[in-house]
Amino acid sequence: MSKILVFGHQNPDSDAIGSSVAFAYLAKEAYGLDTEAVALGTPNEETAFVLNYFGVEAPRVITSAKAEGAEQVILTDHNEFQQSVSDIAEVEVYGVVDHHRVANFETASPLYMRLEPVGSASSIVYRMFKEHGVAVPKEIAGLMLSGLISDTLLLKSPTTHPTDKIIAPELAELAGVNLEEYGLAMLKAGTNLASKSAEELIDIDAKTFELNGNNVRVAQVNTVDIAEVLERQAEIEAAMQAANESNGYSDFVLMITDIVNSNSEILALGANMDKVEAAFNFKLENNHAFLAGAVSRKKQVVPQLTESFNA
């Protein structure tokens, strides 16, 4: 039997990397599975900081599961096929550990699925470590903590579940870090956008959603200065338009999130700007608008877009 590949979504963030590495380890220890954590893209700057801090080598990047000789895969931090490996429909999905909506997903065989409405996939994996009585190595605890911090913006996002607030201090202790100090340093490491090209910037953390027959690209970047990002608006818009044309996106929505003040600016281009405006009850001026209190794509952007596009 070939090795089972474990991976998060395309354009992996800290939770995609952390949950996949942690679950691959747990699957070996608890279930005796022959697993390998891989990635569907190179780590972003935040995740690179995490891996370096805990001395963990980045998972190797793959573009095809079958090309690796894999017959089975385990998905973490995602389930929608368009967010997964290119040939996901050609391999068996052995299992899924996720905290997102379930959409565009079907399998030919029964599978293991663990879905919980918590702040991160890493939160679920940590609970599974405890359920199976498997000791958590320091570096694995650090990766799971980082995934939780990243997805909940240090427990400030509305996606934060009461369970996450219990888990975070436990993981911080296991990882040997101060939760607040490490969390802030980690989040700030991911806000260095000046060195990124516009094409790189809009692809740092981007996912495609099928909304009533439209392929809508929703990306998010974290910053400490929204105005600084908007100084590059023309360049960013050109990259968004090119992405729409080359990938068949009907619309591109970019969240520029201020992690200090917990607000976002929405920059949007495409064929359905009326639906984008209706989703958030705002008016786009020069293609962008302020969205007070919005920091979560999963809870404060995608559901609203889904409702508007389906109206």
UniProtKB/Swiss-Prot annotation:
An example Gene Ontology CC term for this record: cytoplasm
EC number: 3.6.1.1
Cofactor(s) in the UniProt record: Mn(2+)
Reactions performed catalytically: diphosphate + H2O = 2 phosphate + H(+)
A single GO molecular function term of this UniProt record: inorganic diphosphate phosphatase activity
Matching SUPFAM superfamilies: DHH phosphoesterases (SSF64182)
Modification note: Phosphorylated on Thr residue(s). This phosphorylation is StkP-dependent in vivo, however, PpaC is not phosphorylated by StkP in vitro. It has been hypothesized that StkP-dependent phosphorylation of PpaC in vitro may require specific reaction conditions or the presence of other interaction partners.
Ligand binding (Mn(2+) 1): 9, 13, 77
Annotated keywords: Cytoplasm, Hydrolase, Manganese, Metal-binding, Phosphoprotein
Cofactor detail note: Binds 2 manganese ions per subunit.
Superkingdom as given in the UniProt entry: Bacteria
Segments crossing the lipid bilayer: none
Compartment(s) of residence: Cytoplasm
Binding site for Mn(2+) 2: 15, 77, 99, 151
Family of the protein in this entry: Belongs to the PPase class C family.
UniProt name for this protein: Probable manganese-dependent inorganic pyrophosphatase
Source organism (scientific name): Streptococcus pneumoniae (strain ATCC BAA-255 / R6)
